[in-house]
Structure formats: structure tokens, C-alpha cells
């Protein structure tokens, strides 16, 4: 091993033993060029370091190995990274979260290139758990995990990291990029859409669209298109975006989504044949955007919406009559829709198989059973918790030096602008 590398190993050992993590971070940041020049000796360096005791030194070596233009032996490097992430010292790597997250990004990109996304899911889950200070903290690796889960069509491993509400962002020593935030909510929305949890999907797309921005983001644009489609499926109309949404959404993103606005406009007429014509007209756009599946679900949801409208007018109706009123192909298709809607709790009805008549019923829920009371209790607890969090955030902002300085400056400006009463 070259003398400079020996010195690197000795310094890593010494600083780790002394617990001088800040100085160790400075060392590994300066040593990138040295390690890159001695690529053939890096496995020897890894052998001389202990993953638990010298986590930051091992991290620096693996990061450089993965940064090379071509990885000579990917399988060996993959095994080394897998072992490192599962056994490294979490307290140590929190001093270099930027490099640790960078290693995870490199691993993700390599697995995406090799079309092996499933292999990285378990590793990234461990990486997030090592980085997070608490389960409500968002890291840039969350977006990587969601990307791999989407590509592998294996959604459930991501759910524990999506079902929690994020209250904090891991700064990663200033390396956290807005792209990771947008991707987390965009990919998360796609996962929830795939699982047909449209309410949560809509919330995730909304977070991506309403992120403060000064320029058009392609991720925001794609989120906006899916937001329109999921809104129609879930609510039967496009949900209005909050007032704090950036002006670039109205100025630039909306004009780039004309086909989707036309779809929403035709959807509001409740006419399936017109909607089918519009889908055919813009089929190339919807297919190119990979949204044709969602567009077809919009068409299906319009049939359901029209069936729900019939429940407000009729007590009983034949399947044949329903099919003609809703513009379905026949009584068989009408029966299929009604059965699915009964199963999903979208309507309350029964079908008489003898005469093919559908009877509509009132909602049997009386809102007085123990399960319903438990749900109300849970919702109240969430509101109380939210109130406490808002108070804590308000207190945090109030004592923030930058906020205090800015507030004092504003007050001085106001007093300076007031005319003197003695003039």
C-alpha cells in the first residue's frame, strides 16, 4: 500500500478512536483525489478498516469506487456496499449524510441501468433508517427507494415511508436538492395510484405541484397531469389548487397540459361518448405521457358517476334501462359496474336476477357503532397532535435569530416611514 494511503488509513483509525468526527469528515472530503489515483489498492484499504469502528473511512472508499466512470466488478462492489449499509455505525454516518446519500444515489442509478431494481429495495430501507433522526424526517434516499419500488412493481416496501407525514428534511450538509423532494412526492403519488389509494395519491401530487418554484420543473408538470386525472377519478371534478401555489403553474404548466384540461371539460358534461371521442383525439399525447391507463379509469369513473346520479332519481331500474341511460354496451356490462360499485361501497343496491331489476337503498351506516366512535376518536387525536405541532413550529420560528432580526428590521422601517408628530 502506498505511503499516502497508509497515512489515510492511520488518520481514519486515529480520528475514529478519538471520536473527532468533524475532523474525520474534513479528511475524507479532501482524500477523494488520493483514493481515485490509487484505485487498485482500495480493496486493501477496505481490508485494513473496520466497518463499525471506521464507518466514515469505509464510506469514503466505497463512494470513490462507485464514482469511477466504469465499475470493473459490479457484483463485488454491490456486496461491499450491501454489507457496509447493513453494518455501518449510524451515529458516525450522520456526520457525512451527503456522502452517504450520494453512495445510495450511485447504487440506485447502477441498479436502474442494469434493470435490477428489486435488489436495492431492502438496502435502501436500511440506509434510510440509518440516516433518519426520526420517522417523520425526509431524506433524499426516500426518492431512490420509491423509484426502485416503482420499477420493480413492488410497492408495499415503500408504504411505511409514504404513510407517515413528513415534518422535517434531512439537510445532508447542504446537499439536499429540491429534485429529491419533488421525486419523493411524484413517485409516491404514482405508487398510491397503482394501489388505487387515490385520496393519498392526490395529496402527494398536490405537494409536488405546490412546491415553491421560480422555474418550470418537468416533475411538477407530470404531477399536474396526473393530479387532473386522479381528481376526476376520485372526485368527479378537478380539485382546485391551494392559493399558495406558485404562479408558474398557471403561467407555464397549465398551457402545457391542454389535452388534460379538455378532458376535464368534457368529463364535466357527463357524456361518455364525447369523452371517448376526446380520448381518441388525444390518444397519442396520453400514451406518450404514460397516462392512458389513468385516462381509461377516468372513462370508467364517468360511468360510475352517472350510475350514482341515477340513484338520486330512481328507486328501482332495469339493467337494460340503466345501460341505455348511462351509454353502456348492454345489461351485462351494467350489472358488472353495479356489482363492483356495491362491493366498493360506492352505492347501496341489490339486483333481482329473475327480472334484471336493480333496487337502490339508503346508506345503512347509522354512525353509532363502536368502530365509528373509535374512528372519530382517532381523527380527534390527529387534530390535537397537529395543533401541538403547529404551536411548536410557531415557537421555533419566533425564537429563530433570522426571523427576529428580519422582524426588528421591518418594525424599524415602519417607524422610520411614519411622519413625526412634532414636525
UniProtKB/Swiss-Prot annotation:
Keywords of the record: Acetylation, Cytoplasm, Nucleus, Phosphoprotein, Signalosome
Gene Ontology BP, a term: ubiquitin-dependent protein catabolic process
Protein localization: Cytoplasm; Nucleus
Domain of life: Eukaryota
Region Disordered, annotated ranges: 402-423
Residues modified to N-acetylalanine: 2
Pfam family, one: PCI
PCI domain residues: 197-365
Modified sites of kind Phosphoserine: 407, 410, 423
One annotated Gene Ontology cellular component of this protein: perinuclear region of cytoplasm
Function noted in UniProt: Component of the COP9 signalosome complex (CSN), a complex involved in various cellular and developmental processes. The CSN complex is an essential regulator of the ubiquitin (Ubl) conjugation pathway by mediating the deneddylation of the cullin subunits of SCF-type E3 ligase complexes, leading to decrease the Ubl ligase activity of SCF-type complexes such as SCF, CSA or DDB2. The complex is also involved in phosphorylation of p53/TP53, c-jun/JUN, IkappaBalpha/NFKBIA, ITPK1 and IRF8/ICSBP, possibly via its association with CK2 and PKD kinases.
Protein family according to the UniProt entry: Belongs to the CSN3 family.
Subunit structure: Component of the CSN complex, composed of COPS1/GPS1, COPS2, COPS3, COPS4, COPS5, COPS6, COPS7 (COPS7A or COPS7B), COPS8 and COPS9. In the complex, it probably interacts directly with COPS1, COPS4, COPS8 and COPS9. Interacts with CK2 and PKD. Interacts with the translation initiation factor EIF3S6 and IKBKG. Interacts with ERCC6.
Name of this protein: COP9 signalosome complex subunit 3
UniProt organism field: Rattus norvegicus
Taxonomic path: Eukaryota, Metazoa, Chordata, Craniata, Vertebrata
